[in-house]
Every structure is written in C-alpha cells, then in structure tokens.
Amino acid sequence: MIHTPTGSSRRILTFPAVNPCESISLTTLVDSLLQLAGEILSFKPKHFSTNKRSVKETLRHVQTLVIFFEELRIQIRVGSIPAGRSVILSLSELHVIFQKLKFLLDDCTRDGAKLYMLMNSGQVSAHFRDLTRSISTSLDTFPVRSVDLPGEVNELIYLVMRQTRKSEARPDRDDKRAIDSVYWFFNLFENRINPNSDEILRVLDHIGVRKWRDCVKEIDFLREEISVGKKSNIEIELLSNLMGFICYCRCVILRGIDVDDEEKDKEEDDLMMVRSLNVDDLRCPISLEIMSDPVVLESGHTYDRSSITKWFASGNITCPKTGKTLVSTVLVDNFSVKQVIQSYSKQNGVVMGQKGKKKVDVAESLAAEEAGKLTAEFLAGELIKGDEEEMVKALVEIRILTKTSTFYRSCLVEAGVVESLMKILRSDDPRIQENAMAGIMNLSKDIAGKTRIVGEDGGGLRLIVEVLNDGARRESRQYAAAALFYLSSLGDYSRLIGEISDAIPGLVRIVKSCDYGDSAKRNALIAIRSLLMNQPDNHWRILAAGIVPVLLDLVKSEEISDGVTADSMAILAKMAEYPDGMISVLRRGGLKLAVKILGSSEVSPATKQHCVALLLNLCHNGGSDVVGSLAKNPSIMGSLYTASSNGELGGGKKASALIKMIHEFQERKTGPGEPVLERERFVHAW
C-alpha cells in the first residue's frame, strides 16, 4: 500500500489514472501535461535500484515530448491550433499514460519496496513496455499534418513514435543476477543452511538496502502487502519468503541498529505524543473499538467509517454523540486522527483489524519457516556468547520479533531464548534488564513460552516479581506487570503468583504510585483482575494488599483515562462478590461513587457496565440496607434503564436484574403485610 502526503492510498503496481473531462480546454490540458512531465522528469536514474535501462528510455521519451507540448502551448496562445476532437483525444490519452508512468516511477522508488520491486522487475519491465508503446498509439491519432507546427517539432513527434513503437523493455542483466541469487538463498533456507553473508550483502547493495533501518522499512512494506488483497498461493509464498529473508538480513547481516537523526526525532515525538494521549479518544463512539478509518461528520465529531455508515443505513440522520439532526451526511477523512492511530499502533504493536486484511502471523512457506528458525538460533547464540553490545542488539531484535508475531515467538522459544533471558534479568545494565523483560513479556503469550518462563519450581515467577518490585527502570517494572497478566491466564500459575508474598503488593504499588502513567497502571490492573478471575483464593490477598481504597481513590481522580476507570470498576465489582470485599467497598463510599459514574455522560458504556455489576453485587451481598439506600437515589432508575437498553456483554441483563430488585424492594416496603428482606448485617452504604 502506498500512502501519499494527503493520506490517500493505493496498492503498489496499480495505476488508477483519471481521464480528463470531455469539456476540458486545450490550454488546461497542455498545461497539465507539462506539469505531469515535469513531475516525471524530476526522477533521476540514480534514484532507481532496478529497471534502470527502462527508466532512462522512458525519461528520454518524456523529455522529447516536453518540447512538443511547449510548442503546442505557444501555438495555442497565438490561436493557430484548433481545439479539434482528435487533438483533445490524443492529448487526453497521453495525459492518462503520463499519470500511469508517474505511478510506476513512484513505485520504483518506493521507500521500503526495493526488494519487492527487484523480484517483480519482469512485471515492471512489461509495464514500461506497454506504456511506452501506448505513447506511440496516442501520437498516431494526433493530426500532425493539420496542425501548424514547426518542421523540427513534427520530426521529433515521428521520432518518438518510431522509438516507442519498437520498445522492447526487459529486466536489466544485473537485476536478473540478483533475482537468481535471492532464489538461491531461498533454496539454502529450505535446507537449513546459512547463505554466504558476502553474497547477501552484494544483493542488498544492488537494491540500496544498506542499513538496519532499511530492513525495517522493507519488513513494514511486506507485512502490509501480505495483509491486504486477494493473492494466489504463489504470491503469498514469495512474499513470505521475502519476509523471512529480510528479517534474517536485519537480525544476522545488517546488525547495526541505526536510526537517522531526523527519523529518531520523529520517533521520539511520536512516542511522546502516544504516551500523552488518551487511547479512548481514538475509539469510535459507536463501536468503542480503535478506529481503522476515521471520518468527520458535519457536527465535527469523528467516527469509524463502517460504524457511522451502518448508523446512517439504519435510517438515522443525527449525530450519535449530540443527537442533533445533520443537514449533510457527507463523510470527510480525518487524516490527522488516522496518523495518530498509526503512530499508536506502531508504538504498541497493535495490528489494526481491517476488513479484507489477512493477519500476518505464520510463515507461509518452508523457506520462510527455516529462515525464521535460523534467525532465532543466531539470536539465541548471541545471548550466550556475544559481548555486551551484541547482547543488547540481540535483545532488541527479540523484543521486536516477538511483539506481534506468534511464529517468531515459537521459533525463539524452541531455540532456548527463554532460559537465557531469565538468566540476565538480574543484570546491572538497565538496557539489558528492560529489553530482556520486554522479551519475556512477549514470550509469555506463547503456551510453550509460559511453561519455560515459570520453570519447574516456579523460580521464573519469583524473578519476574523481583523485577516488578526492584527493576532499574519503570518500563522494566511495567513489562513485569504485563508478563504476570499473561502468565496468570492459567489457573495454576495464577495460584503460584498469588503465593509469592511481594507479587500482589507490587502490582497494587504501581496502581497507587503517581510515578506511573495510565498504560502502566492498566498493565497492573489487568494483572490483578486476571489473578482474581483465574484463582478465587487470591481475593483475600488482593483485599489485604489494600486494593479497594487504592482503586476508589484512583477513580475519584480526574487525571486518569476512562480505560483505567473501567478496569478499576471491574475489579471492584469482582471484589464485591465476596462479603469481606463488599463491606470494604461500602465502608469507603463505593456505592455512591458507582452511582455517580453510572450517571456520567463522560464515561464509556463498558465502564457503566462494570458499575452496574458492582451495584448488583453490593445489593446481592448487602441486602435490604444497600438496596434501600440505592432506591432513595432519584437518578438511579434513569441510569439503569439507559444501561439496560444499551448494555452489551451481559450489562443489559444485570441492569434489568437490578431494576427488578429495586422494584421488589419498593413493593415490599409499601405493600401491606409484605415481608422485608432479611438483614444479615448492618452496613453504612453511603
């Protein structure tokens, strides 16, 4: 996919040219042709790593045609060129051809697509040949004899016609050699043999991939190309092979992790922006999912295109957020928000799910699979025998590879990386500890990885808890919290984590501390929630760690995101399922706070659902005292009716159950002779 500065996109090697309108003036058409020609001629042969001969020939033809267009413009100004249909038709066809040539040249110089364009140089040559011959066809229809042009210009036209008609563009000889080498590398990978590094460097140098950062761009492009559109098995296999090859090159051959100053500044700016933003601002108000295609309504509010389109298709002509009637339902792309979402996704390893996109998760070919294993074995070796700098480089690669790829997680676990990472967790070098902890966090998502991390005696868990409490950097402690979340998904591990005396207090400390941002707090919160959900015996440990007052104080703060509020309310709701948890929540004003949040218009439906669950559990365990206190609140019924009609994931049923409970209480209270709910204990609810 190619992204233009305006935010529009097109698939590589596709040429969506637009025909000039039939009513276009001759002056406008010629001016536009000259502008297009100028853009084409701004490309220089040195910018191209493949198909250089075809490029040179094409640029030469365009340069010649510029003389023709400039003479046309002069003759038009003096009124000697009639704007006949044949003239307009011929020049319009040339305009379309020039648009396609511009697209093709853009593709040939596409940053990140150099390896892909090399392997498709035959197809690229065919495109150059077809477009060049089309120039001859278009000029054939131009009425040269009826237009008063200088003789030398007419000769140039005939010259271009002859040359373009006989165009035999074909792949360059050097390109063919490089392609053969790449296929030879694939063959070696299939047989689990490491290719000669000098041969790989020769190919990489030919296409202009000379730095670690260049490999990153190639990988990003290939991942995008694999994920979009329908492709044949042959195309998927080639793309997968290229992905395995370029990952091998990045990790094994071009190991100097580099970032240009300009790119580094941009990445740091993006990182600062991502850390400061509220991720819920990137969610569609309708679907509550992070938007993949944000658009703006007339009201100024942004929604995901698919969600707002369904809203309009259902007969609604109002803004979902304000309820105001819209004069226009025109949708305008919100490129600013889209760029922020792309930066957020990149920094957090989020793969945006888009319709028609294939998830890039496994190797689709034998060569790619074996290349991945060779890469993993190399990195595992660097952790054991490499010096400090080589170890850091290997750790960074492991961290990157395991961020979103289940395939590389599996390869690295098989290669024995987990054991090496666990050994260096106690490193005095903060860089080593942070990257090792990040790698463990990612590998804890793998089933086999979980087993190896925990170890036979649970020693791995104790190491992670050490980092959680005493890690050199906040980031290391945050990754430790996230690792505990993934590991706690298994009941036995959840029990083992709970039995480590410093584990739960360490998580609560992150939630409570002002030194951590929302992202770190959410990592700790979801870990606590997982420990609570997967091992009920952990509830008393979590209660003893003081989680209830910490969460209630946190939710009262206006500085946290809705996501933190939702996670906090979910834990409180679960704690209220137990009598001691219910008492702790009530004694600290949890009932009043939940009612307040439920009636707020500034929190998400998910947060309100957790509020309903908390209120329901408080009423179930607190008896008539709690139900009575809740029934006295004049706003509660309206909030519950809204929640029951909008509720998802069981939230609506819980709201309805709570409404029924309040109604039954009120009927028993007012009806003659009706029994009152048994009062098992007295609790001050408000």
UniProtKB/Swiss-Prot annotation:
It is an enzyme of class 2 (transferase). Its EC number is 2.3.2.27. Residues 277-351 form the U-box domain. The keyword Repeat applies. InterPro entries: ARM-like, ARM-type_fold, Armadillo, RING-Ubox_PUB, Ubox_domain, Znf_RING/FYVE/PHD. PROSITE patterns: ARM_REPEAT, U_BOX. GO terms for molecular function: ubiquitin-protein transferase activity. ARM repeats lie at residues 406-445, 448-489, 491-533, 536-577, 579-620. SUPFAM superfamilies: ARM repeat, RING/U-box. Functions as an E3 ubiquitin ligase. This is U-box domain-containing protein 19. It comes from Arabidopsis thaliana (Mouse-ear cress). The lineage of its organism: Eukaryota, Viridiplantae, Streptophyta, Embryophyta, Tracheophyta. The gene is PUB19.
